[in-house]
Amino acid sequence: MKVLITGGAGFVGTNLTIELLKIGHDVKIIDDLSTGLEQNVPKDAELIMASILDLEKLHKAAKNSDVIVHLGARGSVPRSIKDPVATHNVNSTGTLNVLEAARANESHYIFSSSSSVYGSNKALPKNENMVLRPLTPYAASKMSGEALSLSYSNSFALSVSTFRFFNIFGPWQRPDHEYAAVIPKWISKCLAGDEIEIFGNGEQTRDFTYVTTVVQVIVNCISNKVLHPEPVNLAYGNNISLNQVVGLLKNTFPTLKVKYLTPRNGDVLHSENDPGLLKRLYPDITVDEFENSLQDTIDWFKNLP
């Protein structure tokens, strides 16, 4: 199949591209490289350096696509608080643009939303029927993308699959970006012998999901055309506190030091998914233990040139 990945030069996109090429799909990527890296794009994938806000280049890239995986977004909660308009433009208007491209080509459209849409809803574990209470412009923009995707399924019979990503980590994730995720940032600090920082007391929990697991689910969704326009939470209920992550890192970096800082505005205290729907739709997915996945990620970073 011909697959277009928006944001395909990013972390999840790179891992997904590698796997799709391995099993014989044709992959095209559109990415403005604002956070993605050109050198991460496999040579057998075609890269179009453009924003999803560029309608002409987007529609050209999407032409004849069987599947469009929409990963492109302006990520990060703090970044959205700093510039909410830019976040809205890319994540809401940009998503509308990608939906139009999918509709024009009758593509299977796969959308990546975020668990941040639950926001101030403190009930745990999260399930897909809970009330959404976004705390930040980023979360609101992802909620908007979900609604748009569902509306295109209902209004235009577009084949839609929507996932809510939780805290994904693994190889190819950038540690050096201003808004880098916690695990790659911490591993990079550990390798450099620097102390790591935690906003809050470290007892906040996250349902970390290894990127290989996410890729398995998306590939399964593509191969079997699993349609579910209502969002599906993509995490397996393996929540762990940041202090527990630190404890595991100390197995490899015993001299690791931690500095605790004031909590950040907009950060959710606890995140844990109820994977019931995910397991029913994707029963054959293999989920690695967090400790093993974390060690694999450390080893990957250690082997970087």
Which positions does each model-derived feature cover?
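Structural element of the ATP-grasp superfamily
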Residues: 98, 149, 186, 278-279
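N-terminal Rossmann-like NAD(P)+-binding domain of SDR-like oxidoreductases, especially those catalyzing
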Residues: 1-166, 297-300
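Short, conserved catalytic or interaction motifs in soluble domains
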Residues: 35, 171, 236
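NAD(P)-dependent short-chain dehydrogenase/reductase
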Residues: 123, 150-206, 211-220, 247-252
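Hydrophobic (often cysteine-bearing) scaffold residues that line and stabilize catalytic clefts
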Residues: 13, 141, 179, 242, ...
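C-terminal substrate-binding subdomain of Rossmann-fold SDR/epimerase-dehydratase oxidoreductases
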Residues: 191-305
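Short secondary-structure boundary/capping segments
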Residues: 38-39, 78, 123, 187-188, ...
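Residues in well-ordered alpha-helical elements
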Residues: 56-59, 78, 85, 96, ...
